[in-house]
Amino acid sequence: MKHKLFTLLIIMILASVILAGCAPKATTTPATVETQAPAQPTTPPTTAPVAQKRVFRESFSWPDRIDPAVGNDFASSTSLANLYDTLVFPNAKGGVDPWLATSWDISTDGMTYTFHLRSGVKFHDGSLLKASDVVYSYDRIKIIGEGYGYLVTAGVKSVSAPDDSTVVITIEKPSALFLPSLVRLYIASEAIVKANTKAEGPYAENGDYGKEWLQTHDAGSGPYMVKEFPLEQYLLMEKFTDWWGKFNPKAPDEARFIGTTEAVTIRTLMQNHELEVTDQWQSLEAYGALSKIDGVKVAPIPTLSGFYYMVNNKKPPTDDVHCRKAIDYGFDYQTSLTLEWPGVQQMIAPVPATLAGVDKSVPYYTYDVDKAKAELAQCKYAGQLDQNPIIVQWVSEVPDEEKYALLFQANMTDLGFKVEVQKVPWLSLVENTSKLETSPSIATIYVSADLPEAGLMYQQRYSSSTAGTWQQNEWLQDPALDAKITDALATIDQTARFAKYSEIQKDLEDRAASLWIYDQIDKHAYRTCVNLPTVRGETSHVMGYDFFLADIGVDCP
């Protein structure tokens, strides 16, 4: 349908051009000519050519939640990074740069941050951004408690605005990771949100807090703004020309994030020049076909992500540590790596090895059938495995996941486990993992670190705060582990902090909390007429910032 609409639009444009060219020129009534004036050189009408829009289109696994207090997956994070500004911005070196905050002061005790805001920043309605908007945005994500709320509100004592250009944030304990966490505090206009808030809703005097409206609109100040958003199909954004920042001279005028990963559709769109960049969820076979299209390349991009088999620690038979260890020893990791893009590596820790603070000296699980059988013999379900099947749910939008599920099924069947493999849409898996009763034995999910250090990913993957979200199907809910993570994150000295990360790493390995498969390398097929800084390693790999549209150049016919 989209293709037909696009084709119709092109036909209409061509028709208008042809009609303009064929229209009769203005004439005057001819007079009787006895003598003729010398011929004068004629010039064609000087109508300015209509500038061709630069368009960028990328496919994503859907849905795309663009409410800054709700979205936290890949599509949502990429959209939010372009629609909203943040106080600081992640750089390619793993640190942060000034953004809405041009500078900040830190108190001697390390617990009070005073941010000085950039002047003249406009929201998409033309109103000026003020410090009170920062406070409102923080309060909103804290009260709603979704999205990246667990990250940006953790350990924060208070947020205030003494004047329009100053924000003061006080934290409970010094933390080296507080400042980087602010790349997830997307600043929304208080006035715009309030003007579109329904009085009735679950947030007391805040009604619905603008959640219904913000599903399909934005209240940001970022380089792009929502033009239209039919929820199930695509998000269309247009350049915000009053953005305070600097655009690539060839930055797209419009960007369309398309909600499909279906291989035939993607290939057709690329062949027809109706897609500039694919999602990262195509199969190896699909990437091979895409790479044969003229003007298309496939780029491997390092990430902060890992591929997890999230093992439910609360349901039989995986609530028994010996069954979990049997699984971790019984999986053929090396064979699994051959199913992926060349160059991927087995996960050697509970978080990706690309993160600072991973202890590479800690032993990790390798394929060892004898050890797997020895552990299984100690499992309390050893004699009744047929009565306690392992339910594996893989994401239908990521077809390559089926190969891993079938390999897992074969490996575990050899040990004596009964395994049922289920193909489910991403939205269904998100819903299933939200409640213990509906959580499968294993959910197969890619997770990207919110920040480029191990501690934050231990928090987002294994702390009680993320149980009941798609980021944790393990349901650990262990106060002792929570305390370890909190203590490590509050440790300012890097050497001491990394030592505490090592202890957490050993703890999770000893529990066999998950089946850790491989450190992800994203693959994107892209048209070579698009200038992508991320392909050259010039962007942060914090999820969503790889495709910051203001830095992308489009020079496609």
What is each residue range found by the language model?
Residues 59-108, 139, 219-221:
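N-terminal lobe/hinge region of extracytoplasmic solute-binding protein
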Residues 150-202, 230:
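Surface-exposed binding/hinge segments that line
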Residues 91-95, 186-247, 254, 370:
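Gly/Pro-rich hinge or "lid" segments in bacterial periplasmic/extracellular proteins
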Residues 25, 29, 58, 230-233, ...:
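Ligand/substrate-recognition segments at binding pockets and active sites
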Residues 242-288, 418:
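Ligand-site clamp/hinge motif
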Residues 224, 318, 345-379, 396-404:
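Structural transition elements
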Residues 102-147, 162, 168-170, 269, ...:
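Aromatic- and charge-enriched surface segment that lines or borders ligand/interaction sites
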Residues 230-234, 239, 330-359, 400-409, ...:
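Detector for C-terminal structural segments
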